[in-house]
């Protein structure tokens, strides 16, 4: 699907306002501003809506504060049918091996889309088929759920909220939910992660991005952020322009969304406002500052933990705050946490316990052992990133361990 261009050859992005209870009206208005739903969906098309159902809502909060609103997905389903779509399906694969069927049901998405004639598809239960990535830089071949490859039209429907890897989980980040669980953690290293996202776009090729900004998050996203009644939907066919305008609308600059300069360099769209035509509401009328997630917080908040750093990437950076976990800390002890390549070490450790995390730090094993007091044995946590070694505690900490688990991916060579 080509980006909508005006006579001045600008990418077109629509901004519309309203309440989530009038989602269809607000979304239709935006669609009409960029060429109408018929410019995206044709008669007989099989459409797949890709929401963000990555995380369950925070305790005590309604689902639409954390995941793509069921009302948005129901509205898009109806509009696609009105354009002549043969079938409209909604599907995702949540984060951290949570089962898709659980999230589709618990968020109300399944009930909402089925009520208007749509279907849900549990992408984690579908066969994964490997395809070449056209123009792939990091990904040359990628396995994707079969319904993605079967769809005539894919509409990307992210939730506007901050995340810990990058800044905001918007259009490009939302495509990461199509990667098999078995491949996700090794692709969370920065900046590698952003090249994965742009390569995913090249094979998935969403025809349209619709940002659900009715209720957004700020702060401790992607799950525990504070909800804000924003009442805005932003959409467009240029994924870079649509994401750039969204970042501006929530009070920040496009270059802060680290995937965008990479995507623009690869000619996936533009983040230059001079090359973007905004229709509907003005950017100034909706713009408000929102807090980002503390993803760059490279420390453990416990006063009992002393960090010794070398050159580390975000693959280990995320796990610093969780190593050790609060329940692993004895308040009467001090812990040395060593992370990164060629870490700066003391002549002798004075802490009671020593934790060495990640493949890079493990390479300094001999120097670390030399700095240990006699009789002390460090605890080595390997991995790049060390996800699998720390994941169980993370699941327990966020109560994810109590949720149904996704099946192993069924990789099919078709």
Regions found by a protein language model. Name each.
Residues 1-414:
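N-terminal and secondary-structure boundary signal
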């Amino acid at each position: 699907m080509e980006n909508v261009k005006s006579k001045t050859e600008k990418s077109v992005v629509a901004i519309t306002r309203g309440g989530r209870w009038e989602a269809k009206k607000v979304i239709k208005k935006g669609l009409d501003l960029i060429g109408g739903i018929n410019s995206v969906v044709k008669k007989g098309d099989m459409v797949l809506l890709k929401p963000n159902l990555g995380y369950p809502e925070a305790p005590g909060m309604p689902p639409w504060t954390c995941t793509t609103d069921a009302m948005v997905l129901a509205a898009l389903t109806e509009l696609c049918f009105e354009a002549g779509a043969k079938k409209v399906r909604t599907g995702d694969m949540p984060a951290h091996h949570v089962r898709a069927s659980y999230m589709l049901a618990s968020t109300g998405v399944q009930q909402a889309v089925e009520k208007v004639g749509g279907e849900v598809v549990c992408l984690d239960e579908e066969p994964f088929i490997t395809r070449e990535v056209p123009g792939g830089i990091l990904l040359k071949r990628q396995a994707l759920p079969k319904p993605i490859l079967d769809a005539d039209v894919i509409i990307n429907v992210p939730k506007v909220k901050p995340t810990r890897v990058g800044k905001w989980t918007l259009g490009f980040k939302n495509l990461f939910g199509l990667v098999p669980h078995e491949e996700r953690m090794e692709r969370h290293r920065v900046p590698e992660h952003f090249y994965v996202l742009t390569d995913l776009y090249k094979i998935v090729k969403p025809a349209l991005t619709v940002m659900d900004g009715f209720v957004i998050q700020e702060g401790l996203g992607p799950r525990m952020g504070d909800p804000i009644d924003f009442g805005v939907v932003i959409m467009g066919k240029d994924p870079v322009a649509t994401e750039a305008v969204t970042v501006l609308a929530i009070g920040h600059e496009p270059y802060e969304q680290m995937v965008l300069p990479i995507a623009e360099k690869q000619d996936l769209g533009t983040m230059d406002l001079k090359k973007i035509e905004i229709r509907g509401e003005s950017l100034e009328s909706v713009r408000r500052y929102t807090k980002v997630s503390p993803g760059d917080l490279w420390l453990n908040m416990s006063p009992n933990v002393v960090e010794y750093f070398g050159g580390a990437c975000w693959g280990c950076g995320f796990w610093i705050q969780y190593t050790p976990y609060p329940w692993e800390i004895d308040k009467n002890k001090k812990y040395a946490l060593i992370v990164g390549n060629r870490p700066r070490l003391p002549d002798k450790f004075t802490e009671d316990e020593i934790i060495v995390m990640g493949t890079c730090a493990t390479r300094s094993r001999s120097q670390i052992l030399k700095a240990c007091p006699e009789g002390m044995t460090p605890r080595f946590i390997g991995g790049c990133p060390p996800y699998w070694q720390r994941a169980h505690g993370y699941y327990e900490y966020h109560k994810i361990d109590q949720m149904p688990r996704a099946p192993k991916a069924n990789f099919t060579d078709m």
